[in-house]
Amino acid sequence: MTMHNRMMVTGAGSGLGREIALRWAREGWQLALSDVNEAGLAETLALVREAGGDGFAQRCDVRDYSQLIALAQACETKLGGIDVVVNNAGVASGGFFDELSLEDWDWQIAINLMGVVKGCKAFLPLVQRSKGKIINVASMAALMQAPGMSNYNVAKAGVVALSESLLVELRGLEVGVHVLCPSFFQTNLMDSFRGPTPSIKAQVSKLLEASPITAADIADYLYQQVAEGVFMILPHEEGRMAWKIKQQNPQAIYDEMVVLAEKKRNKSRA
């Protein structure tokens, strides 16, 4: 990768955001790290410096556009601009549609979808000037829509749709766009879980813990795919296979999801 090697990462205080920062830090990049978890941010910044990078950390709640604007201004002042923006901050949620409240929906959409929209909006002038890149973190849930997590599915599907829109709109401005859609991997995402169905949280937690893939693995794969110019980045092999099947025979996937929904409902009633 060329450019000036300056990256901003939201949700950098832990998990995937931290590992993305560290992966680019090992290449000598300067990192602007943001999160609502200030203690986690301090840890990430120390790790970034140990890995060979540098930069600064600034608290930022992606629900607040003014905080994102302030972060963009800090990137301008401290780094002279930005080359890659990673909209990674996100939260977990789940529950059957009839049990989810509108407040559950508002919370999920405000962070996982509108946080990405606002991040793109706040940083577009900087990446447009540097002819840089935007990396939005979505999920395989955006493509496969598992039952019992409709608000999460919708938010992440919105991130994919936004990224597709930006891909075509910004090509002429020489701004690259990528969207990352990981499946389950070892992460602390469930610390943020909100939802009315405890059994779904337990089921998802078990899947996360059982995954052989770590956040560092995802970050490594992301680095390689961005370097190759891949738009939709699917780091899990089973995710790539499932997406291919859905494109060829969507009804087969829907039928499978109906069975899965009944299994989840039965477990929630047990």
Question: Which residue stretches match the model-derived regions?
Answer:
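Active-site loop immediately N-terminal to the catalytic Tyr-X3-Lys motif
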Residues: 98, 146-150
